[in-house]
Swiss-Prot record:
This is Bifunctional protein FolD. Its EC number is 1.5.1.5, 3.5.4.9. The keyword Cell wall biogenesis/degradation does not apply. Homodimer. NADP(+) binds at G165, R166, S167, S190, I231. The keyword Hydrolase applies. Pathway: One-carbon metabolism; tetrahydrofolate interconversion. InterPro entries: Aminoacid_DH-like_N_sf (IPR046346), NAD(P)-bd_dom_sf (IPR036291), THF_DH/CycHdrlase (IPR000672), THF_DH/CycHdrlase_cat_dom (IPR020630), THF_DH/CycHdrlase_CS (IPR020867), THF_DH/CycHdrlase_NAD-bd_dom (IPR020631). One of its GO terms (biological process) is L-histidine biosynthetic process. Belongs to the tetrahydrofolate dehydrogenase/cyclohydrolase family. SUPFAM superfamilies: Aminoacid dehydrogenase-like, N-terminal domain, NAD(P)-binding Rossmann-fold domains. It comes from Prochlorococcus marinus (strain MIT 9312). Signal peptide: none annotated.
Length: 298
């Protein structure tokens, strides 16, 4: 029987540790950790994601600061807000909720975030440190995936790992993290020739292509581990309802694999949890607190 890599269960276990850590250490720091979230515009999905992050912060004892800006705000005003938060001693982590309206220079805004507060790990300094395998903030989804694999003692070192997708949010940083952990990594994308053949060589296959049900059993070898990063909302057979699915056709793949992540409840919860972890690590460094959470670092 295939093993389900339950991200929801693991995230709750980690959150319990985070809650205990904050409870003990805020007596030393004299305050709880703080996370600032900047949302621009009225994208409905962004509203849901920000709400989820706010709730997660509340569960573990992180104080959240939500800045919801209208989409008619100017680039310079957002830059000024980021600079203000960079110097706010009550803010340990900061993120720009993506996507933002196209009129903004997204990468320029991210570059304004102090690397020590860049909990999404997207600032060019943090990306550069990842390339050099130096300590820095790591992207949340890749870090969550690595913790999922570790939770079931799934070996990374020496394994053939195929990553489908080359985004800055997932594919690129994940490939680098796995490489730093001595995995043998192949990064694929929409222009890869014979994608099916390449994927069938993988001991660990990670689908972050952004295409619903792209991967069926013909892409997967017997006994592989499959990680599904995708999440899509499709119409169900009942026209009035929708259903969630990933990049992987799970019902077709499960009989063949050693382990898999479900959608929902796999990678998603771990992404939010690693955001909390990054915020706490920034807080920990600021106050020289104990490093009992270091096993969560990718």
């Amino acid at each position: 029987m295939s093993l389900k890599l339950d991200g929801k269960k693991l995230s709750l276990e980690i959150e319990e540790r985070l809650n205990d850590y904050i409870f003990i250490n805020k007596k030393i720091a004299k305050r709880a950790p703080g996370l600032a979230v900047i949302r621009i515009g009225e994208d409905p999905a962004s509203g849901v994601y920000v709400n989820n992050k706010e709730k997660a912060c509340s569960r573990v004892g992180i104080k959240s600061f939500i800045f919801h800006l209208k989409d008619n705000v100017e680039q310079k005003e957002v830059e000024q807000l980021i600079n203000k938060l960079n110097f706010d001693k009550n803010i340990d982590g900061m993120l720009l909720q993506l996507p933002i309206p196209k009129k903004f220079d997204e990468q320029r805004l991210i570059s304004y975030i102090n690397p020590s507060k860049d909990v999404d790990g997207l600032n060019e300094i943090n990306i550069g440190k990842l390339v050099k395998n130096e300590p820095a903030m790591r992207s949340c989804t890749p870090a969550g995936i690595i913790n999922l694999l570790r939770s079931q003692n799934i070996t990374i070192e020496g394994k053939k790992i195929v990553v489908i997708g080359r985004s800055l949010l997932v594919g690129k940083p994940l490939s680098l993290m796995l490489l730093n952990l001595n995995g043998t990594v192949t990064m694929t994308h929409s222009k890869t020739l014979d994608l099916n053949k390449v994927c069938k060589e993988a001991d660990i296959l990670i689908a972050a292509a952004g295409k619903p049900n792209l991967i069926d059993s013909s892409f997967v070898k017997e006994g592989a581990v499959i990680i599904d990063v995708g999440i899509h909302r499709l119409k169900s057979s009942d026209k009035n309802k929708t259903r969630l699915c990933g990049d992987v056709l799970l019902e077709d793949v499960i009989p063949k694999v050693l382990a898999y992540t479900p959608v929902p409840g796999g990678v998603g919860p771990m992404t939010v949890t690693m955001l909390l972890v990054n915020t706490i690590f920034s807080w920990q460094k600021q106050f020289g607190l104990s490093s009992t959470l270091n096993d969560l670092l990718p």
